[in-house]
């Protein structure tokens, strides 16, 4: 029997210096003219980093926003947030002093990092609304936790909720250097973490693109929002020309790395290119409509334009969903997790529904 042919997995090497070069503050000043306005807060106090890592979200009592009801959300064993466990703990007076002493101190914004809290509030006051990120990642996977279902933050508590609920942010804090061939256990300890607050502006997701640059050449361009938009295909030459001009004339002459991944935005009337982010040339970066094997191994035709890949037909299973929808939950569940009374009411309703289902099941079996 003939052996099945297969494409061997291509080794993609990334070094810790590559990761550091893609940290927002490392490149923002070089491309400030082409990047949405932002404020970088660094260094971040150790208490704030512990706050992001703790099991629960303690919101600020200073924020006059009734949406959050000024209390603590606790993370349960399923990595979901509620205050149910917090209430149970509060009613339990049997904890010994030793148990209490063994618990880590809970970080509270206005107690443990009041200066940072006020600085964030000042930036929001200046910009009106912001969208946050750390060195590399934005909490795109946690937008479900805000009432507007976007990363648009109107107050400090919005930022605390997004950052605490995001797996992307947790990855930045704990695993940013995991794929580096020269990884050192001290890398995460030595990095200076930063909070980036970008001025909010509405982006048409259809006009965001991911650009793969290898050895100072564009090897591929992918639509970033994986839904079908019928007006994109006739414009693909316009998109390619804009991106080529931006990468070769602006980015490559001013950026230290020769292999990296850009996120860009092409606003109408398609006369300019905005730089949104720079990501490492690494398998940890989503290849979207490409695969990392083909990006790392395919030959480049120097006489041809870079390949741009778009969604060219309706994928109904994908089109009716939103990015990161696997992280989202019904609005009544979110509201219940923020309000103790709503949580009790919702839990009561669930129990009643379960009893009815069990009763129906018993009657059917009889």
Curated annotation (Swiss-Prot):
Keyword Membrane listed: no
InterPro entries in the cross-refs: CDC123
Location of region: Disordered: 79-108
Residues involved in Mg(2+) binding: 277, 279
UniProt biased composition (Acidic residues): 79-98
One Pfam family matching this protein: D123
Origin superkingdom: Eukaryota
GO molecular function terms noted in the UniProt entry: ATP binding; magnesium ion binding; protein folding chaperone
GO cellular-component term (any): cytoplasm
Single biological process term from Gene Ontology: eukaryotic translation initiation factor 2 complex assembly
Subcellular location per the Swiss-Prot or TrEMBL entry: Cytoplasm
Keywords per UniProt: ATP-binding, Chaperone, Cytoplasm, Magnesium, Metal-binding, Nucleotide-binding
Annotated binding of ATP, by residue: 133, 136, 138, 140, 198-201, 208, 210, 224, 263, 277, 279
UniProt similarity note: Belongs to the CDC123 family.
Job of this protein: ATP-dependent protein-folding chaperone for the eIF2 complex. Binds to the gamma subunit of the eIF2 complex which allows the subunit to assemble with the alpha and beta subunits.
Protein name per Swiss-Prot or TrEMBL: Translation initiation factor eIF2 assembly protein
Gene name linked to the record: CDC123
